[in-house]
C-alpha cells in the first residue's frame, strides 16, 4: 500500500467511525482503565484477529442491565448504541426467564425437517404485527444472512440478479451483504464483489451533492437517479434500503412512495432493512409503517431479545413459490431458544407500549436537542424518529464542514461522564438507547452531552 493510499484508508476509517486507534483513545485508556482491565485489554489484543472498528477495544465489560453497560471496574454507562440489540433493555428479565423455561423444557436445537412450537408461534406473531400482507417468515442466525436470504428470494422470484442500494449504506459484513452495501470500508481491497450491484444517493436533505435546500428537489433528483438505472439496467431484481438511514436521515413519505411506484413499474422488489429500526425503535413497531409496506421486510438484532443472535425475513404470500429451491437453509433456522427470546421481547414491547414511549420520548429529545442547537453553533443539524436520533456536528454553519476531531473529543468526554454512543461519518453522534429509558435518564444523558459540547466549543481538548 502506498503512502497516499494509506492516508486515504485512514481518512475513510475516521469518517466511518474508527476512533479506537487515535491518540485520544490512548489517553482514555490511560486515564480510565484499571490494571486489571488493562490486563484483559491486552489479552483481547493478543488472541483476537485484529480488524478495523473493533480493534483495539475501548473497554472491558462485566455486565449490562436495562439502559446501562458496566465495565470491569464497576463504572456504569448509559449506552446509546448497543449495536441495536437492546430495544427491550439489556439482560431483560422476561427474556431471560423465557430462555430458561425453554432450556428446562429440553428442546434447545431443532434438526432440519422438523419444527417446534416456539418457532411456529414466532412466525405467526410476526404475521400478526408486521404491516398488512406480510405473512411468510424465514429465520437465520444473523442480519447479514437475512439480507442475503432477501436477495436470494428477489433473484428467484424475478429471474433477475441486479440490485439498487444506497451509497454509505450498511447491510451486513457477509460477502453478499457487504457487496450491496455502500460503505467503502467493508469492501475496499476485496476486488470484484456482487455483480450487478448499483448504488444511488439517499435523500439527505441537510447534506446532498447538489446543494438543494428543498426536500422536493432532493426527492425528485434521487428518484430520477433510480429510474435512470432501472431504464438502463433491465435485469433489476430489487431495490434495498433502510427506511431511515443509520445516520439517521429521515426521508419523506413521498420519496418512498415514489420508490415503490418505480419498483412496480419496472418489476423489482422493494426490500426494507429494518435490522436496526424494527421493534419500536422509530415510534412505531416497524419503521416501514411511517412510509410504505415493502415486498420483503428484514429483521434482526433486537429480534433475539438482546441475548441471542437471531434474524429473519417476512414477505408476502405471493412470493411463497420456491418450494423447489433453498432460500436460507441455515442450521439454526428454527432455533427454539431464539424463538422463545423473540416472543418474550415482542410481548414486553407490546405490553409496555414501548413504541408509543419511543415516539413520545423521541419527540421530547428532539425538542431539547433543537434548543441545544440554538445555543451551540457546533450543532449543525438534528434528525430522527422515535429513539433513533443523530446530531451532525460542524465547524462552520455556512460550509457544513464536518467536525470530526471535535466529535471524537466529545465522545471521550461523555464516556468519562458515563455516557456511551457511536459516531457515524466521523461527526454524527447517534443516540439509540434502550426503549426502556425514562425521561429523567434521557435528561441526564443530554445534560452530559451538552456539557461536553460546551467544553469543546470553549476550546478544551481531551
Residue map of PLM features:
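Conserved N-terminal phosphate-binding loop of PLP-dependent enzymes in the Aspartate aminotransferase
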Residues: 7-462
Amino acid at each position: 500500500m502506498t503512502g497516499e493510499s494509506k492516508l486515504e484508508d485512514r481518512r475513510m476509517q475516521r469518517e466511518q467511525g474508527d476512533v479506537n486507534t487515535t491518540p485520544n483513545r490512548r489517553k482514555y485508556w490511560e486515564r480510565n482503565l484499571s490494571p486489571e482491565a488493562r490486563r484483559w485489554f491486552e489479552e483481547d489484543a493478543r488472541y483476537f484477529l485484529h480488524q478495523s472498528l473493533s480493534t483495539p477495544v475501548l473497554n472491558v465489560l462485566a455486565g449490562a442491565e436495562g439502559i446501562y453497560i458496566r465495565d470491569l471496574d464497576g463504572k456504569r454507562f448509559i449506552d446509546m448504541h448497543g449495536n441495536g440489540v437492546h430495544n427491550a433493555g439489556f439482560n431483560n428479565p422476561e427474556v431471560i426467564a423465557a430462555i430458561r423455561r425453554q432450556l428446562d423444557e429440553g428442546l434447545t436445537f431443532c434438526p432440519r425437517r422438523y419444527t417446534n412450537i416456539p418457532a411456529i408461534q414466532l412466525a405467526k406473531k410476526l404475521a400478526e404485527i408486521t404491516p398488512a400482507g406480510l405473512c411468510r417468515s424465514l429465520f437465520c442466525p444473523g442480519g447479514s444472512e437475512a439480507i442475503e436470504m432477501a436477495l436470494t428470494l428477489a433473484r428467484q422470484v424475478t429471474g433477475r440478479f441486479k440490485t439498487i442500494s444506497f451509497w454509505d449504506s450498511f447491510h451486513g459484513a457477509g460477502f453478499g451483504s457487504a457487496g450491496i452495501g455502500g460503505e467503502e470500508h467493508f469492501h475496499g481491497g476485496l476486488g470484484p464483489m456482487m455483480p450487478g450491484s448499483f448504488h444511488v444517493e439517499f435523500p439527505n436533505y441537510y447534506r446532498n451533492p447538489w446543494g438543494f435546500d428543498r426536500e422536493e428537489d432532493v426527492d425528485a433528483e434521487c428518484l430520477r437517479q433510480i429510474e435512470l438505472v432501472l431504464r438502463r439496467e433491465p435485469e433489476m431484481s430489487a431495490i434495498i434500503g433502510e427506511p431511515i438511514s443509520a445516520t439517521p436521515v429521515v426521508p419523506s413519505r413521498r420519496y418512498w412512495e415514489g420508490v415503490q411506484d418505480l419498483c412496480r413499474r419496472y418489476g423489482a422488489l422493494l426490500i426494507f432493512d429494518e435490522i436496526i429500526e424494527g421493534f419500536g425503535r422509530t415510534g412505531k413497531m416497524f419503521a416501514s409503517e411511517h412510509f410504505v409496506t415493502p415486498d420483503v421486510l428484514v429483521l434482526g438484532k433486537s429480534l433475539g431479545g438482546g441475548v441471542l443472535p437471531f434474524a429473519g425475513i417476512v414477505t408476502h404470500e405471493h412470493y411463497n413459490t420456491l418450494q423447489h429451491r433453498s432460500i436460507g437453509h441455515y442450521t439454526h433456522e428454527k432455533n427454539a431458544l431464539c424463538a422463545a427470546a423473540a416472543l418474550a421481547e415482542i410481548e414486553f414491547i407490546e405490553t409496555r407500549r414501548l413504541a408509543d414511549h419511543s415516539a413520545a420520548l423521541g419527540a421530547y429529545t428532539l425538542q431539547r436537542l433543537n434548543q441545544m442547537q440554538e445555543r451551540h453553533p457546533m450543532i449543525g443539524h438534528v434528525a430522527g424518529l422515535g429513539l433513533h436520533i443523530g446530531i451532525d456536528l460542524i465547524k462552520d454553519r455556512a460550509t457544513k464542514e464536518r467536525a470530526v476531531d471535535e466529535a471524537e473529543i466529545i465522545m471521550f468526554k461523555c464516556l468519562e461522564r458515563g455516557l456511551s454512543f457511536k459516531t457515524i461519518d466521523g461527526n454524527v453522534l447517534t443516540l439509540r438507547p434502550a426503549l426502556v429509558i425514562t425521561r429523567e435518564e434521557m435528561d441526564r444523558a443530554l445534560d452530559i452531552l451538552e456539557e461536553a459540547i460546551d467544553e469543546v466549543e470553549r476550546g478544551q481538548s481531551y
